[in-house]
Amino acid sequence: MSCFCSVQEEFYCEVLLLDESKLILTTQQQGIKKSTRGSVVLDYVFSHVNLAETEYFGVRYCDRSHQTFWLDPSKTLAEHKDLIATGPPYTLYFGVKFYAEDPGKLKEEITRYQFFLQVKQDVLQGRLPCAFNISAQLAALAIQSELGDYDPYKHTAGYVSEYRFVPDQKEDLEDSIEQIHKTLLGQVPAEAENNYLAIAKTLEMYGVDLHPVFGEKQAEYFLGLTPVGVVVYKNKTQVGKYFWPRITKVYFKETQFELRVLGRDCNETSFFFDAASKTACKNLWKCCVEHHTFFRMPENESNSLTRKLSKFSSLGSKHRYSGKTAMQIGRESTETLPRADLQVIRTRSKTYPKRSTQPAGRNNGGQAVTKMENTSEGQPKTSALTPVKSPRVKAESASVQQEKPSAPWEEDAPQSGLYNSASERNKSPKFPKAHRRSPSGGSENEPRHRRGQTADDAQANKQHRRRSRSRGNTSSGSESENSNREHRKKRNRSRQSNEMVDSAPQWEVVLRRQKEKTPNDPNQRRSRHRSRSRSPDVQAKEQLWKHIQKELVDPSGLSEEQLKEIPYKKVETQGDPIKIRHSHSPRSFGSTGAPTARTERGLCCPKSTLALIWFLLWL
């Protein structure tokens, strides 16, 4: 029993960090089990990243419906039902939970560096939209932080195209980034990152945690939780903004979410929204309570307001934010922070093939053109032009994009991490993905003649299938097809010639063969099914055939009375009585539902049964 419990408690998890590296948490290495609380997992992640200002960060996960949830430090991993249902393996995503109003006031450089990585990811994935000139400034500062000062010998033409900063990055933007990068001489990485955050914090969508909801007449809205309050978006336009001091009540019941706001005339106004599910509505309420507590409440009022907000929820749903608030963090003494011996280790960003300046790929019919370029490290790098998509593929991709719900940001960039597809998130070195063979394509071990066919073979198979269908009884049921079929039947009947022959010798041969047959005759063909039309009494047949007149009679010399009367003879046979068995199968029931009787094979005719045989004496 203990072994069975240990298998259930085994836990394997991958934590994706902001620098695109992974932290593996397992039962064997860190001793993390399903009964471990979320605070232990957070401590391992914070220790690995070397964070001291941990209140701004958290770990989230996705359920099977791609709904995101923050890991609750007070609950065990097993209590996160949506997380357990996705694995193993389990995937967590480290990121910023509460965006600081002024990231420049963060005390440690490592904290600002993690904020820089998070905001840069938001811009790349389209969650933080910005204008062309702002995008160029932010990207130039990111290049300065990673590559340092511009060097014409190291940074050759097109070096900016090796990095990705915005969705659908164009060549003109890369040229602007290169020009701005030349003007940033002397800025060290920490200074460039601070300038990056100083520009990003002024953007409208900075730090907005969006939740899709429905308003009146099922209109699509987005509720955004920000450091200053709640914003409402409709059709990518801000239609409302409510500051945290004005929000007096947050309530949810089933899928309905209520936001009560105090107006300037001291009158309260309630705004109602509908979420997609009860789980999504509860998650919106929890995030709203945590944001309200973290950014709004002083130290002595945070716990009381959290308890007050928890009473406004539905029955049985109580949630309390137990961490420090932004005001508490600001009032703490700065004696321990920043740490004197702290060293920030920055990782290189992911690079891509350099953009080709020669439009040679356009003259090759959309075929990929590969070029070799020398990098600064002296190793050759391969760059390939993207093949041209067919109009059908473009139409399908456009239809898929139209099915996505509209949001205040664009999602055209290749997403990674938390915003990947479910198939990409579940990849793991410990749990490799099983390879399935496509039913339409043959495997490598399959014979070649089964996998591939020439054009002649395909045409022959097609003709063979056409002939098979013509021999079958399948038809479309159209009137023209039925008329053609009737016409063919009449034509075939007209070709046949009916000729009268003497059948007496044929019948004698048949009777002689039946007498010669024995039960053990191997040449006798046996049927697996019972024949209902076969008579088992051979002796009765012989007696009847003796009285049958086989010669043809000429009716020309008969009178009218003789023609009207048909002569017949009475023949009596003897045999065992018939055994009747009632069948209750559905097929044997008539319209009234009463079972019908049937005669079994091998039984004789009843005694004194009159067999009335009528034979025509003329044709």
From Swiss-Prot:
Residues 323-541, 579-599 are annotated as: Disordered. Keywords: Calmodulin-binding, Cytoplasm, Cytoskeleton. It comes from the Eukaryota. InterPro entries: Band4.1-like4A_FERM_F1, Band_41_domain, FA, FERM/acyl-CoA-bd_prot_sf, FERM_2, FERM_central, FERM_CS, FERM_domain. In adults, it is found in the ovary, eye, heart and brain, but not in gut or skeletal muscle. GO terms for molecular function: calmodulin binding. It is found in: Cytoplasm, Cytoskeleton. One of its GO terms (biological process) is actomyosin structure organization. Residues 428-438 have a biased composition (Basic residues). It holds the Pfam family FA. Residues 354-385 have a biased composition (Polar residues). Transmembrane segments: none annotated. GO terms for cellular component: cytoplasm; cytoskeleton. Residues 11-299 form the FERM domain. Residues 471-481 have a biased composition (Low complexity). Residues 510-519 have a biased composition (Basic and acidic residues). Not known, binds calmodulin. This is Band 4.1-like protein 4. It comes from Danio rerio. The gene is epb41l4a.
